[in-house]
A protein has these predicted regions:
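Active-site histidine-anchored catalytic micro-motif
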Residues: 17, 21-158
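N-terminal amphipathic/basic-hydrophobic helices that include classical n-h-c signal peptides
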Residues: 1-22
Length: 158
């Protein structure tokens, strides 16, 4: 049978070097202007546009929010009541005014909502298109608006 190296002559190092050579990484960003304190904005088209411009057909895209009172999530885009229900539930879990909050800026609830929702999402790319379910979209989640915010996008692949 021979040992492993005879049967598989490509070393881990050479595989890693080939991977690095064919992997392309594109960094981009865009602004989002929010209109209310709590809001979900569909940013799927902006992300798809960045993927289109990157020329990457297969890989993934990281969508990142560099703010402590806003986040990124993937959820249903067909029924706006879903967004309403998400924001309502988060506001019930973390009310704006709660006895015991110690953060003195008045936005402790916003920090808590951000921690629960998260600040990033990873979406696969296949054939140059975001791999999302029929009803899914990527949403920017504002928890301390209205504000102008930044979204960072990194597209990786080939």
């Amino acid at each position: 049978m021979g040992d492993f190296n005879e049967r598989y002559p490509i070393s881990y190092r050479s595989i890693r070097e080939v991977f690095v050579i064919i992997m392309k990484i594109i960094n981009d960003n865009f602004s989002v202007s929010t209109r209310s304190r709590n809001q979900m904005i569909d940013i799927t088209s902006q992300i798809q546009s960045i993927v289109n411009d990157s020329g990457i057909s297969d890989g993934d895209v990281v969508v990142y929010c560099p703010h402590t009172t806003a986040g990124i999530t993937i959820n249903e885009n067909a029924d706006p009541d879903v967004q309403h229900d998400i924001l309502l539930t988060l506001s019930e879990i973390f009310p704006q005014r709660r006895a015991g909050y110690r953060h003195c800026e008045g936005n402790s609830d916003s920090h808590c909502k951000c921690s629960l929702v998260g600040c990033s999402e990873l979406v696969l790319i296949k054939g140059g298109r975001l791999v999302l379910g029929t009803w899914q979209s990527v949403f920017f989640c504002e928890f301390d608006g209205p504000r102008s915010r930044n979204v960072i996008v990194q597209v990786r692949g080939q």
